[in-house]
């Protein structure tokens, strides 16, 4: 909201400067976003009167003016402005004047004729971009008067950034109330005595929708002169408040809206074809608005109709059909209280906004409508003339303002400072909040213009604002420092984040709400948790997997020429669970486990001239996952399985101690192609609880004996997983004390014979490497051979394996 300081000071004029005024408003919650001068700095410009004008002897487009600048002698000024004429009052930059931009005025000869100064346009003074001619000033201004004083150009324009709850401050009067409360300066509110009623013409109005309109008032005014000029003082205030002057009737309506916060509408009475009705629109109805936009209406939008013809979009904008023009003679002046809920969001549906809707959807004073009708009428009669009829005022459904109780002790506790009872009473009085004292409580009845006061904390906020946040002492919080034991067997989210980051992954944070298609495609979830009020229409469901969001970020980076992307996210997912009840951290019916997901795409390692380039694959990311589990990695199992987001032949279910904890695999080719990725990213998703638990390190004796390495190659069924054989080896070691010296076993080679035409390969060779070491003695060949034989026998018995020659 923008307004000139002079307008504000016409209602309340505290003895403080502009900067202090801006500071106090900001500290009271009315943020002054910007202050700027009404005009740029310039000097030496005065009011002047063109006494005579003659053609230039050597230039057709120039004229020689004799100008009275109040000094007692006429100045000769050469001017080329098309509107220069005798009798005109204009700005004159005297010799020695300095204009915006640093231009200095001196005596000059123009085509042989001396010019002692310059007559100025609005653009040359920095007042507007208008340079079509000289700036015409009111004839009543005295020549020689400094132009800055004559036009109040030292005024300051305030721009406020208001919060949505402070609708009462969307007017000069509202801001003036605040200034009066903050400074204790008396407030002079705009007022008008009821105008004499000289005609008895009325326009019947029926309110058919009390849930739309709670109060409707209006009056007929006949014989107005719509061509009357808007007074300069009003035009200046409107322009400095960011409003364009249109015509006297429109300007008066806008002026009162800005001054007292009362949107109103002026109908051309002769264009209204019947009695007025206020109702909800009907399907199929249309309206051409004042901005030229034609809109299709529906029952969710309020309208004012004449007979069956829609004339106005209630609380938003009038219609073109009944708009006033310069030929208008008779008008109907309307002001109403529209329920905020009935106006909110309606203008945005039609992709525009209006000053009226901006105010009505936040709440406009419903008690002062008759007084404001009189104020507007007085201005119309004074400027445009006419005869006023009686005011018809219908009240059908006004808000009931329930008293709000504020406990003084509660106020002290919330603010952290003991504001005296007398000062609290004074604050409420200065704010215009009627109250009663009941013991240590204040019972306040919110005024009709304060829609933001509903609960006790609202009143405490009012006390804090006027008391002054700067007066509240800074008190550091005091708490008993208590050491909490951190269990070694469990790690927190930050520790897990550091682990993943150490594996060359970068953390991202996505929205928890996603597209419904993502849930269906990536998680196979046809019944996700849906949002009642999504922030965007496509983000309509809660995610049950983190994978889709990571793939979307990979796509975003790939489109921007990134060739290697490694990301992770730690966040909650949402699953339906009818068995889950409400709790401190739970919502009934929705399970919210914490998950860790990662994605790797592009090169397996950073590009380096001495290292062959290859794409990251399943086993690279499998190694990353195993590294996250540390000593518990030997309890991990990767079981071939299918998941909607993953490649059917390159995906695995991750199990820990036999329990499923997540998934690992390449992205499904369909989703890879859909994301326009030239090769598939590898993704994983893990239950955080499985990662949080860790195995404590066990101290064991460090062997001084050399290790022995032996290899064993076996033929087995081609479909047998290598992990099954490693599990058999681990079971044999645990069961047989003689195998306690076997420290590790790994697969180091897989070999298959080339298939013969028409035949399938039924066997494969798996080569295992074993590390054997004793802590007491050096192992001899007999002991080593015996251990390898025992392992081979266990594998033969369990998997029908045979040793490869």
UniProtKB/Swiss-Prot annotation:
SMART domains: B3_4, B5, FDX-ACB. Mg(2+) binds at residues 452, 458, 461-462. GO terms for biological process: phenylalanyl-tRNA aminoacylation. The keyword Nucleotidyltransferase does not apply. Residues 399-474 form the B5 domain. It catalyses: tRNA(Phe) + L-phenylalanine + ATP = L-phenylalanyl-tRNA(Phe) + AMP + diphosphate + H(+). Residues 703-804 form the FDX-ACB domain. Its EC number is 6.1.1.20. It comes from the Bacteria. The keyword RNA-binding applies. Its cofactor is Mg(2+). Coiled coil: none annotated. Residues 39-148 form the tRNA-binding domain. Pfam families: B3_4, B5, FDX-ACB, tRNA_bind, tRNA_synthFbeta. Keywords: Aminoacyl-tRNA synthetase, ATP-binding, Cytoplasm, Ligase, Magnesium, Metal-binding, Nucleotide-binding, Protein biosynthesis, RNA-binding, tRNA-binding. Transmembrane segments: none annotated. InterPro entries: aa-tRNA-synth_II/BPL/LPL, B3/B4_tRNA-bd, DNA-bd_dom_put_sf, Fdx_antiC-bd, Fdx_antiC-bd_sf, NA-bd_OB-fold, Phe-tRNA-ligase_IIc_bsu, Phe-tRNA-ligase_IIc_bsu_bact. One of its GO terms (molecular function) is tRNA binding. It is found in: Cytoplasm. Binds 2 magnesium ions per tetramer. GO terms for cellular component: phenylalanine-tRNA ligase complex. Belongs to the phenylalanyl-tRNA synthetase beta subunit family. Type 1 subfamily. Tetramer of two alpha and two beta subunits. NCBIfam families: pheT_bact (TIGR00472), YtpR (NF045760). This is Phenylalanine--tRNA ligase beta subunit. It comes from Bordetella bronchiseptica (strain ATCC BAA-588 / NCTC 13252 / RB50) (Alcaligenes bronchisepticus).
């Amino acid at each position: 909201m923008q307004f000139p300081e002079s307008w504000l000071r016409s209602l309340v004029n505290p003895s403080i400067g502009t900067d202090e005024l801006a500071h106090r408003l900001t500290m009271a919650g009315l943020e002054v976003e910007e202050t700027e001068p009404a005009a740029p700095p310039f000097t030496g410009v005065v009011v002047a009167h063109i006494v005579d004008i003659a053609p230039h002897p050597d230039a057709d487009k120039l004229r020689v003016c004799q100008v009275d600048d109040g000094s007692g002698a006429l100045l000769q000024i050469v001017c080329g402005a098309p509107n220069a004429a005798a009798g005109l009052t204009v700005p004159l930059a005297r010799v020695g004047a300095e204009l915006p931009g640093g231009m200095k005025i001196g005596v000059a000869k123009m085509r042989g004729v001396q010019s002692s100064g310059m007559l100025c346009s609005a653009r040359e003074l920095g007042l507007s971009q208008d340079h079509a001619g000289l700036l015409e000033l009111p004839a009543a201004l005295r020549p020689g008067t400094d132009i800055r004083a004559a036009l109040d150009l030292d005024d300051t324009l305030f721009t406020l950034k208001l919060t949505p709850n402070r609708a009462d401050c969307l007017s000069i009067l509202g801001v003036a109330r605040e200034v009066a409360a903050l400074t204790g300066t008396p407030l002079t509110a705009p007022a008008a005595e009821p105008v004499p009623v000289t005609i008895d013409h009325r326009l019947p109005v029926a309110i058919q929708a009390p849930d739309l309109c709670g109060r409707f008032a209006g009056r007929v005014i006949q014989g107005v002169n719509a061509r009357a000029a808007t007074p300069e003082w009003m035009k200046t205030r409107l322009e400095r408040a960011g409003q364009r002057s249109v015509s006297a009737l429109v300007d008066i309506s806008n002026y009162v809206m800005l001054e007292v916060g009362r949107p109103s509408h002026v109908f051309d009475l002769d264009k209204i074809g019947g009695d007025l009705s206020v109702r909800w629109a009907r399907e199929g109805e249309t309206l051409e608005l004042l901005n030229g936009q034609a809109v299709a209406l529906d029952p969710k939008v309020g309208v004012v109709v004449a007979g069956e013809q829609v004339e106005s979009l209630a609380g938003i904008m009038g219609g073109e059909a009944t708009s006033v023009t310069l030929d208008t003679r008779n008008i109907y002046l309307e002001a109403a209280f529209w329920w905020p809920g009935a106006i909110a969001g309606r203008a945005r549906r039609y992709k525009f906004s209006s000053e009226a809707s901006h105010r009505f959807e936040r709440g406009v004073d419903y008690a002062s409508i008759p007084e404001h009708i009189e104020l507007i009428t007085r201005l119309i009669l004074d400027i445009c003339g006419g005869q006023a009829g009686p005011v018809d005022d219908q009240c059908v459904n006004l808000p009931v303002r329930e008293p709000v109780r504020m406990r003084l002790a509660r106020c002290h506790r919330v603010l952290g400072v003991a504001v005296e009872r007398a000062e609290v009473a004074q604050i409420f009085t200065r704010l215009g909040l009627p109250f009663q004292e009941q013991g240590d409580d204040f019972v306040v009845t919110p005024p009709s213009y304060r829609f933001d006061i509903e609960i006790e904390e609202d009143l405490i906020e009012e006390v804090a604002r006027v008391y002054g946040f700067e007066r509240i002492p800074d008190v550091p919080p005091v708490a008993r420092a208590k050491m909490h034991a951190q269990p070694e067997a469990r790690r927190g989210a930050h520790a897990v984040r550091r682990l993943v980051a150490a594996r060359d992954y970068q953390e991202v944070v996505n929205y928890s709400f996603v597209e419904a298609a993502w849930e269906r495609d990536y998680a196979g979830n046809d019944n996700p948790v849906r949002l009642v009020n999504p922030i965007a229409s496509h983000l309509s469901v809660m995610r049950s997997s983190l994978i889709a969001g990571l793939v979307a970020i990979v796509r975003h980076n790939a489109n921007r020429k990134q060739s290697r992307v490694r990301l992770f996210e730690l966040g909650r997912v949402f699953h339906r669970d009818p068995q889950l009840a409400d709790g401190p951290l739970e919502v009934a019916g929705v399970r919210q486990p914490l998950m860790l997901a990662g994605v790797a795409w592009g090169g397996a390692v950073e590009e380096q001239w001495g290292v062959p380039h290859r794409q990251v694959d399943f086993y690279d990311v499998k190694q990353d996952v195993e590294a996250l589990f540390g000593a518990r990695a030997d309890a991990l199992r990767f079981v071939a399985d299918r998941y909607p987001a993953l490649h059917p032949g390159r995906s695995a279910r991750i199990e820990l101690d036999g329990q499923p904890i997540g998934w690992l695999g390449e992205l499904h080719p369909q989703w890879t192609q859909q994301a326009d990725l030239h090769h598939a990213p590898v993704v994983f998703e893990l239950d955080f609880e499985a990662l949080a638990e860790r195995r404590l390190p066990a101290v064991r004796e460090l062997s001084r004996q050399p290790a022995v390495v032996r290899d064993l190659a076996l033929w087995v069924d081609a479909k047998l997983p290598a992990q099954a054989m490693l599990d058999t080896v681990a079971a044999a070691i645990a069961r047989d004390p003689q195998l306690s010296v076997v420290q590790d076993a790994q697969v180091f080679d897989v070999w298959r014979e080339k298939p013969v035409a028409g035949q399938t390969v039924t066997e494969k060779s798996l080569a295992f490497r074993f590390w054997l070491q004793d802590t007491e003695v050096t192992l001899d060949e007999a002991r080593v051979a015996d251990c390898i034989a025992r392992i081979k026998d266990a594998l033969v018995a369990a998997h029908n394996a045979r040793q490869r020659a």
